[in-house]
Every structure is written in structure tokens, then in C-alpha cells.
């Protein structure tokens, strides 16, 4: 359960992303499968609340925001890759632009704010978001991937 202090209360888009990955991993998309309705609602929730800067973290706390963004971005990318629904491309493109903007320009890592030296937990989520976006057909992820690796 949630910590009594409320820690994690504003990480709903990260949790939604993770739940979507479970549905997607079982073969469901927002168009097909016994849980298509659930996937459709989850994807709509993530994309409808996308911030102007491209973040999919919605109202996540500072230290949770980039984690939530990465999880949600992976879910959108995987849904696009599985369904071929081009309507998801603009949201994914904005999300990846945010991912790249948050990357440290020299070390290639991610942390909590632009320019922060990276840590491995953030690196994993953001690199997976880049790989998933590339696998979904998004072009231009390679320079950020190369900086990270």
C-alpha cells in the first residue's frame, strides 16, 4: 500500500504506464483484446494530460516526475508499435522531445532536472523509452541513445 505520509500519491501516470505495459504484454491494445477498453482509457488518460513541455508525468512530485514520464512514454510507444495507430505519434513525439531535453548533454544520463548528472535507475527508464519509440517507428532517437550508451 501507499506510505501513510502520502509519498507516491502523485505518481498515477507512472502506475498507469506500468499497468498498461502488463495489458500490452498480454497482447491487448486499445483496439484489440479482451481488455481493449481498459487500455484505451489508460492511453487516453496519459495523452490527454500531456503537459506543454511533452512530459507525460502529469502532476508527479519532482523526484518522481521523470520516472513517471518514462513509464508512461514506454506504454504509449508500445501501444503504437503493437496497434499501428498513427494517432498516437504526436503524443509520442512530444514525449520523446521531453526525454531528450532532460538528458545531460555531455554524460548522456538523466536524473531529476535538465543538466543533472544521471543515475542508473533513470537511465534504464529513459533508454527503454527511446528504444520503444524507435521500435514504434519514431525517427531521430539514435543520437540520444548513443549519448546514453
Report each predicted region and the residues it spans.
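Preference for long, amphipathic alpha-helical scaffolds in soluble/luminal domains
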Residues: 1-149
Amino acid at each position: 500500500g501507499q506510505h501513510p505520509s502520502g509519498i507516491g500519491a502523485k505518481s498515477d501516470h507512472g502506475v498507469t504506464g506500468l499497468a498498461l505495459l502488463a495489458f500490452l504484454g498480454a497482447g491487448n491494445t486499445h483496439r484489440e483484446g479482451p481488455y481493449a477498453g481498459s487500455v484505451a482509457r489508460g492511453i487516453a488518460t496519459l495523452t490527454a494530460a500531456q503537459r506543454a513541455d511533452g512530459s507525460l508525468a502529469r502532476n508527479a512530485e519532482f523526484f518522481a516526475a521523470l520516472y513517471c514520464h518514462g513509464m508512461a512514454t514506454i506504454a504509449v510507444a508500445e501501444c503504437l508499435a503493437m496497434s499501428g495507430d498513427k494517432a498516437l505519434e504526436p503524443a509520442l513525439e512530444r514525449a520523446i522531445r521531453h526525454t531528450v531535453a532532460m538528458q545531460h548533454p555531455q554524460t548522456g544520463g538523466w536524473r531529476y532536472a535538465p543538466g543533472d548528472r544521471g543515475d542508473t535507475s533513470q537511465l534504464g527508464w529513459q533508454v527503454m523509452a527511446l528504444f520503444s519509440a524507435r521500435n514504434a517507428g519514431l525517427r531521430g532517437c539514435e543520437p540520444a541513445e548513443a549519448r546514453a550508451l
